[in-house]
């Protein structure tokens, strides 16, 4: 077979013969470089890629151009086209742009794109939380009871908690004036802060869907699919979209629950504070308090050791035998302060900031006290 192929290639005018002849001539004329020679050949940097000394450019660093990436060969024709007109975004100045959402006085449309990723559509959750059905309460009772018992076992039996002023929290949950909402605020050191901290409460509270708190949970962590969304929804968690400001359905729903006299728990830091630094509190809690039809009771709390119970590192396993300290502070008496803000018609963005600042001041004192109590246990 090989001889037949070679004889055919030797025929005059054969295309394969002409191609073979060209390849042989190219190899003979050293047009081909063996791989070993190519590897041994010394590397020479291209002239256009060599850096130019900065002394040739007396301007600032921002005015200098990167010659290595913008050098144009002299043989390339110049582009004589006129410059393109400016885009609409370039023609706008800062005075024509709308103010940020946190500084607006009216509730803007929630349909405005925010750039926040939405892994799962949560729009269907809010109507069910706003007007719960009888079926919702039945399922919620099972979920709340299961989570409450689990939290109590983990906190009270598997670890070593110490709660200061526990009766104060229980009294405000069960015996506050009818119709007056309760807003508890605390630091956020662990993903198990809620519901783990509520394991210190009696079973009559922690396993009662009518008495247990409403709480906001991150939409991109807790509400990522239908199953998780159902679980947290029946657990009285409200999906909050972090990064779109205080005017959103989660804050609106908290205000509605406050109008009904319910208990609402807020982590005003807005995230798990793994570094334990003093963060500026988010103003959403200020809006809930200021816009509530009835001024709520504001109860600050501080805890230490929850990040030891459930560390913020993999494999995220609940630990045993850890010391946890929960300190329930004094209720903040802001009634006169809030009434004065409303009487003077202080703009809502300013009012909610002033209220949040009051909570931040209470946090500083409560944190120092709780850290001291926690150190004394060790």
From Swiss-Prot:
Phenotype upon loss of function: Cardiolipin (CL) deficiency, faster turnover, abnormal CL fatty acyl composition and abnormal muscle mitochondria. Poor motor performance of flight muscles. Significantly reduced climbing speed and endurance which does not improve with endurance training in contrast to wild-type flies. Normal response to cardiac pacing. Male sterility.
InterPro entries: Plipid/glycerol_acylTrfase (IPR002123), Tafazzin (IPR000872)
Intramembrane stretches (start-end): 138-158
Transmembrane segments: none
UniProt GO BP: cardiolipin acyl-chain remodeling; cardiolipin biosynthetic process; cardiolipin metabolic process; inner mitochondrial membrane organization; mitochondrial membrane organization; phospholipid metabolic process; sperm individualization
Motif segment (HXXXXD motif): 188-193
Parts forming coiled coils: none
Residue span of region Disordered: 46-112
GO terms under cellular component: endoplasmic reticulum; endoplasmic reticulum membrane; Golgi apparatus; Golgi membrane; mitochondrial inner membrane; mitochondrial intermembrane space; mitochondrial membrane; mitochondrial outer membrane
SMART domains: PlsC
Pfam family, one: Acyltransferase
Pathway: Phospholipid metabolism
Top enzyme class: transferase
Membrane topology of the entry: Peripheral membrane protein
GO molecular function, one term: phosphatidylcholine:cardiolipin O-linoleoyltransferase activity
Keywords: Acyltransferase, Endoplasmic reticulum, Golgi apparatus, Lipid metabolism, Membrane, Mitochondrion, Mitochondrion inner membrane, Mitochondrion outer membrane, Phospholipid metabolism, Transferase
Mitochondrial intermembrane side: 1-137, 159-378
Localization per record: Mitochondrion outer membrane; Mitochondrion inner membrane; Mitochondrion
EC number in record: 2.3.1.-
Family stated for the protein in its record: Belongs to the taffazin family.
Function summary: Acyltransferase required to remodel newly synthesized phospholipid cardiolipin (1',3'-bis-[1,2-diacyl-sn-glycero-3-phospho]-glycerol or CL), a key component of the mitochondrial inner membrane, with tissue specific acyl chains necessary for adequate mitochondrial function. Its role in cellular physiology is to improve mitochondrial performance. CL is critical for the coassembly of lipids and proteins in mitochondrial membranes.
Misc. remarks from the entry: The enzyme was named after a masochistic character Tafazzi, once popular on Italian television, apparently due to the difficulty encountered for its identification and characterization.
Protein name as it appears in the record: Tafazzin
Gene that produces this protein: Taz
